[in-house]
């Protein structure tokens, strides 16, 4: 199984209930693509480097998923249809990209 990073930026103005609804939908989309979630980092609202739509902030969710095959298109295409999702990025995790801390 390959490991992937799934990074999402959500609408910064959504409530805690809506965030939970989005998390549930994301979990279902990942499972439907034949993958499993191994880690979730909920970073909350952060300032964006540039404006996305009318927003200068975004609600960040970073998942680590394990999947066989190529789940990128199946997961990303279903998540991009959501109204509260601003950006989706699925990247294959490679150990050589990790930096070593001194």
UniProtKB/Swiss-Prot annotation:
<dbReference type="InterPro" id="IPR000529">
    <property type="entry name" value="Ribosomal_bS6"/>
</dbReference>
<keyword id="KW-0694">RNA-binding</keyword>
<dbReference type="GO" id="GO:1990904">
    <property type="term" value="C:ribonucleoprotein complex"/>
</dbReference>
<dbReference type="GO" id="GO:0005737">
    <property type="term" value="C:cytoplasm"/>
</dbReference>
<protein>
    <recommendedName>
        <fullName>Small ribosomal subunit protein bS6</fullName>
    </recommendedName>
</protein>
<dbReference type="GO" id="GO:0006412">
    <property type="term" value="P:translation"/>
</dbReference>
<keyword id="KW-0687">Ribonucleoprotein</keyword>
<dbReference type="InterPro" id="IPR014717">
    <property type="entry name" value="Transl_elong_EF1B/ribsomal_bS6"/>
</dbReference>
<keyword id="KW-0699">rRNA-binding</keyword>
<dbReference type="InterPro" id="IPR035980">
    <property type="entry name" value="Ribosomal_bS6_sf"/>
</dbReference>
<dbReference type="GO" id="GO:0070181">
    <property type="term" value="F:small ribosomal subunit rRNA binding"/>
</dbReference>
<dbReference type="GO" id="GO:0003735">
    <property type="term" value="F:structural constituent of ribosome"/>
</dbReference>
<comment type="similarity">
    <text>Belongs to the bacterial ribosomal protein bS6 family.</text>
</comment>
<dbReference type="InterPro" id="IPR020814">
    <property type="entry name" value="Ribosomal_S6_plastid/chlpt"/>
</dbReference>
<comment type="function">
    <text>Binds together with bS18 to 16S ribosomal RNA.</text>
</comment>
<dbReference type="Pfam" id="PF01250">
    <property type="entry name" value="Ribosomal_S6"/>
</dbReference>
<keyword id="KW-0689">Ribosomal protein</keyword>
<dbReference type="GO" id="GO:0005840">
    <property type="term" value="C:ribosome"/>
</dbReference>
């Amino acid at each position: 199984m390959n490991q992937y990073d799934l990074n999402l930026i959500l609408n910064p103005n959504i409530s805690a209930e809506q965030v939970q609804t989005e998390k549930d939908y994301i979990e279902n989309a990942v499972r439907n693509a034949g993958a499993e979630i191994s880690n979730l980092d909920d970073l909350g609202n952060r300032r964006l480097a540039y404006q996305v739509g009318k927003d200068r902030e975004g609600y960040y969710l970073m998942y680590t998923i394990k999947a066989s095959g190529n789940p990128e298109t199946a997961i990303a295409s279903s998540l991009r249809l959501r109204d509260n999702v601003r950006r989706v990025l699925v990247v294959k995790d490679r150990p050589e990209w990790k930096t070593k801390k001194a």
